[in-house]
Curated annotation (Swiss-Prot):
Gene Ontology MF terms in the entry: ATP binding; tRNA binding; tRNA-uridine 2-sulfurtransferase activity
Origin organism lineage: Bacteria, Pseudomonadati, Bacteroidota, Bacteroidia, Bacteroidales
Annotated residues for binding of ATP: L6, I7, S8, G9, G10, V11, D12, S13, I32, G120
Keyword list, A-Z: ATP-binding, Cytoplasm, Disulfide bond, Nucleotide-binding, RNA-binding, Transferase, tRNA processing, tRNA-binding
Protein's GO biological process: tRNA modification
NCBIfam families registered for this protein in UniProt: PRK00143.1, trmU
Region (Interaction with tRNA): 142-144
Protein name: tRNA-specific 2-thiouridylase MnmA 1
Record CDD domains: MnmA_TRMU-like
Length: 354
């Protein structure tokens, strides 16, 4: 079996290479470059990444190929993120990167030449009723199925997740014992293309600043100013620059550039327990066979907690009623649905409050 292994320079993908080689495979290694050339601030740690990837390839006598997809990434993933922010929504570029770049453009460029593509994602492949499903990882803290919830059946059919049955500490132990070049490297945080700058600085470069009012939700009183609604997301409590906190962002008026905040943030009163998903995407198929309601697990952000609730259908919307109050439901983010035992990731849709 011919295997392409996506390698990033991190410990997870290096352990994937080690495990594949231990099983007798000789995968071809691929590093996907997505950082923007010509701007030292807006680049990933590509040079260091490639050095570690090269060392890993050399250790196992494998070939390393560098695939430059930075233009496709910026034209699709970054453009998507900026568009969502302009519309007052909260984007998830990691989800779109997996769908469009890692398992989209890469498949067109090189992946189609291989039987399987292996990655360091914490997820698993399950077979049920003769079909392939995206399964959750053994390690709930590291589970990344929510980042994979927009891929399609053809993509999931080609993927291998060798780390799916391992805990993170076990992965670290394997890397240490095998003396992998990246064994001591820290896990990456945040969005890769941001490089050396933070998210707000990235938004400032592309969207600028525009002063607007901060209004207390309960009283309608103006209590401060902000530099643009695009710097703030629903549920946010840091970075508002207000005294007497904590303050939470409750709502955004993008037409008037107003941020509404609340001092107490009572989730029952501010949001309740219900939200909707539109344009729902099934990875394999409808696990619930079109049933009008079903018990489900779900996530509304990247977290180690699978929430419990009830799914109902209304026209083109999936409505979710959570068993417990939710904080910071952010329109634009992906709501990810699982079976009630949180073993199968069924798919995802974009969160809306309508």
């Amino acid at each position: 079996m011919n295997i392409a292994a996506l390698i990033s320079g991190g410990v997870d993908s290096a352990v994937v290479v080690h495990l594949l080689c231990e099983q007798g495979y000789k995968p071809d290694l691929f590093y996907i470059k997505i950082g923007m050339d010509g701007d030292e601030d807006l680049t990933c740690t590509a040079e260091e990444d490639i050095e570690l990837c090269t060392a890993t390839a050399r250790k196992y006598g494998l070939s390393l190929n560098i695939i430059d997809l930075h233009r496709q990434y910026w034209d699709n993933v970054v453009a998507y993120a900026i568009d969502k922010v302009k519309r007052g929504l909260t984007p998830n570029p990691d989800v779109m990167c997996n769908k469009l770049i890692k398992f989209g453009c890469f498949e067109q460029e090189a992946g189609h030449l291989y039987d399987k593509t292996a990655t360091g994602h914490y997820a698993s492949i399950l077979e049920k009723d003769g079909k392939i499903w995206l399964g959750t990882a053994q390690d709930p803290v590291k589970d990344q199925t929510d980042f994979l919830a927009q891929i399609d059946y053809l993509q999931i059919s080609k993927l291998m997740f060798p780390l799916g049955g391992l805990m993170k500490n076990e992965v670290r132990d394997i890397a240490r014992i095998a003396k992998l070049p990246s064994a001591q490297r820290k896990d990456s945080q945040g969005i890769c293309f941001l490089g050396k700058i933070n998210y707000n600085e990235f938004l400032r470069r592309f969207l600028g600043e525009k002063e607007g009012d901060i209004i207390e939700m309960e009283t309608g009183k103006r209590i401060g100013t902000h530099k643009g609604y695009w710097f703030h997301t629903i549920g946010q409590r840091k970075g508002l620059g207000l005294g007497g906190g904590p303050w939470f962002v409750i709502r955004k008026d993008i037409d008037e550039n107003i941020i509404y905040v609340s001092h107490g943030y009572d989730t029952d009163k501010q949001y309740g327990t219900d939200f909707a998903l539109h344009d729902f995407h099934f990875i394999t198929e409808d696990l619930w066979k079109g049933a009008p309601s079903a018990d489900v697990s779900f996530k509304i952000r990247h977290t180690d907690t699978f929430m419990k609730g009830i799914l109902t259908r209304e026209d083109n919307l999936f409505r979710i009623h959570s068993h417990v109050p939710l904080q910071g439901i952010a329109p634009g983010q992906f709501g990810v649905l699982y079976d009630k035992n949180a073993e199968i990731c069924v798919g995802s849709g974009e969160i809306t409050l309508s």
